[in-house]
Amino acid sequence: MLTFCRQVSTLAKSKVIKTARPAAAKVIGDVLRHRRSLNGILRTALLSLPENERGLCQQLCYGVIRWHPQLQSIADQLLSKPLKNKDSDLQALLLCGLYQLRAMRLPEHAALSETVNGCAALGKPWAKGLINASLRNYQRNQSSIDNKALDNDVATYAHPDWLIKQIKQDWPETWQQILEANNVQPPMFLRVNQQQQSRQEYLTRLIQNNLPASNVDLSPEALLLDTPCDVYLLPDFLTGAVSVQDAAAQQVAAILQIKPQQRILDACAAPGGKTCHILETEPSNEVIALDIDPERLTQIKQNTDRLGLHATLKTADAGDIDSWWDGKKFDRILIDAPCTGSGVIRRHPDIKILRRPSDVDSLVKKQQQLLEKLWPLLNTNGLLVYTTCSLLKQENELQIMDFLTKHAEAEELLLTSAPATRRVAGYQRLPGENTLDGFYYACLRHC
């Protein structure tokens, strides 16, 4: 009998989940417990769900991860003792319930009952009483529980303490607005492939397909959708008419000042948005795109194929010159450097969970190595554009200031059309400015 019971329990745990709430709980639990990236595991989870459950699952995953420090602080008020590590999925299910009650326009009784039913789908029906009691307690006493739970910056702004302190230090006048912008659901920007049609022509097609949008002044190829949609609803997406890319990232191609007959290096290229934009600007140029991750390099290939473009793709660490360089110098080098991603938290809220304070120093060191290794590969009068999607000064203006003091043959090129706010070195856009992502740009000329 004991063996039979164990077999039944194993089957319950291993069966495929077909509803949004327990599916979201498993994804969130994996992010919290195993520090796995949200995008990858969510993509896999959605494939196993019926189409009518996918939207809610995605909304729960992003919402709970975005507000995790706040929701966790509330959950701590509801539980007499923490759940065990092996029950991270139950912890996540409770957070899903709280998120529905706090932020989603769902009937409360349905949100509560369906969340409680998720315990059985997770193979843990014994937890129904615990989840039910916790959520009902919150329903009854929300105001007093919130007052206790939200009495500190970590819970109020839903960011880890170390990151709040760093942003306060770097941006003492605007740190609160930055944190608030990080918690806003991001808009959806498009980049029109002008090798196929003009921006105005594509805008007309969007409107004809009941997808209202508007031009973005900061980039000549950029459109902003009124409401985000599935990419496969975009006219001729599969045949390369358009790509999804934040307008802040779209400004990079203009800063490179691309001309015909140039040899261009995109040193940290995946997933390929900037590589493709460079080629759309001048398809005949020789573009070498590197990435250390072969799976991510495959993403670049998929994007260039969809857009009908060609780049030379190499799996390599850009800093390991001997492993990939053929000895010919470049006219343009783009270092879209690995960084904390602190400027794009609104798009990747799991950054709050996955990043650690120690990451900053290691990333700054890697950025410095890339600058030092790749700079000698640039032709005289060539341009090196250094970008990050970070807002931390160590990774941005301080990094470039340090580089310029060490290299007399390097000068910063002041841009006639500033892509963002001028800093001591480079240009910084903070998250949410003009509804764009946080981004840093510096353009260096080899004298």
Language-model features: locations:
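S-adenosylmethionine
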Residues: 2-447
